[in-house]
Amino acid sequence: MKRWILFLILSVFLIGCAKTKIVDDIDLVQVAAYDTEAEGKLKGTFAISAYKGGGEGETKIYSASGQTGREVLARASEKSSGPLELGQLRVIIFNEKIIEKGMQEILETLNRNPSVGNAIYLAITNVKGESLLKGNYSKEKEIASYLSSLLEQNMNNGTQPKTNFFMFLNQLDDDARDSYLPMISKKGNVLELNGIALFKRCKMVDKVNPKDLFVFKLLTDNFKQGTYQFKLPGSSNTYATIENIKARTKYKMEGNSKHPFVNAHIQVKAEIQEFTKTKNLDNPKEIKKLEKIMGKEIEKKATTLIKRFIKKDTDPIGLRKLGRTHVRKWNSQEWEESYKHLRFRVTADVKVTQSGVTE
C-alpha cells in the first residue's frame, strides 16, 4: 500500500515538472511558405489563425530569414506575441527556386518534430511565399482553410493525384518510385492548381500541365470521382463530358531487370453527362464508338506521358517497385540503365453509360 502511495506522489511530482504549453500562450502555425533570398539565405513566411470575440477569425503573417528552418522559425517567433509552434500545420508551400537549395533539409527537420503530422499538404509555387499568403482570396475562409480545401477537394474529386507530407518523404527514402507535388499559381485574388511537378529524388525534373493530369492520375492513382472532357475527332466543337469516374490501371512486367517489358491496362467506368454533337445515345453501337474513341485517346496520351517519364529519368508510376515484386533475381543497377530504353504497351478499356445526357 505504501508503495502505491509513493508511486502516486512521484507521478504527480513528475507531471508537475513536465514542460507544458498552454494554447493561449503560443501561436499555432497553419501554413508555412519557404523561399530563397540573397546569399543563399532561407526565408520563411508563417500564417497563424487568431480568433477574436464571437468566433470571428483573422490571419496573422510573420516572416523571417536565416540559414536553417529552425533559425527562421525562431526569428519569426521574435515578432509574434507568443512562440510559433507547428502542431496545427496544414500546408507547406515551397517556391520553385528553393527546391535545389534545401527543400530536403527543411522536410527532414519538420519530420523530426513530433508535433508535425503526416497528413500535411505540400505544394510548389512560382510566387513569393509572403505575397501568396497575404492575398485576399476568400471572405468565408482564412488562407489555411482555403489552401487545404483547394488541395483536398481536387485530390478527392478532381484530376489531382493524391500526395502529402508522409507519402512524399516515404518516396524520398524508398527507391520504389519518384515523387510529385501539386503546383499552385496566383492570378489576381484567385489561387489555382496549375499542374504537378515531377521529381527525381529531391530535384524537380519536369512539369505536367493541367490538361494532362487526367491521364497522369490514371497512371499513378485510383480514380474514385471526377469529371473529364474529351475532344472527339471531326468538328472542332465536338466534345463529350464524363463524370462519376471509377478507374484503375493494372501493370504487368515481363522479362527481367535487364530486358523488362511493361503492360499497362487502364480500366475506366464513367457516365456521359454532356455531348455536343447530335447522336442517338440510346443506340449501343454509338456508345461503343464513343468508348473506342475515348480509349484510343487515353492510350495515346498515356504513351506520350510514359515516354516523357523515361526521357526525364523519373518514375512516378512506381515501376521499380513492380519489378522488385514480380521479377525474380531483380537487379536495381541493371534497372537504372534498362529504364532508359524501357519497352511498354498501353491499352485502355472504357465503359460508359448515358446518365442524364444533355446535348
From Swiss-Prot:
PROSITE patterns: PROKAR_LIPOPROTEIN
InterPro entries according to UniProt: Spore_GerAC-like, Spore_GerAC-like_C, Spore_GerAC_C_sf
Family annotation (Gene3D superfamilies): Nutrient germinant receptor protein C, domain 3 (3.30.300.210)
Compartments, as annotated in UniProt: Membrane
Lipid attachment locations (N-palmitoyl cysteine): C17
Signal peptide (residue range): 1-16
Keywords: Germination, Lipoprotein, Membrane, Palmitate, Signal
Lipid group attachment sites (S-diacylglycerol cysteine): C17
Membrane topology, record value: Lipid-anchor
Pfam assignment, any one: Spore_GerAC_N
UniProt superkingdom: Bacteria
CC annotations in GO: membrane
GO biological process entries: spore germination
Record family assignment: Belongs to the GerABKC lipoprotein family.
Function per UniProt: Required for the germination response to inosine. Has no role in L-alanine germination.
Protein name: Spore germination protein GerQC
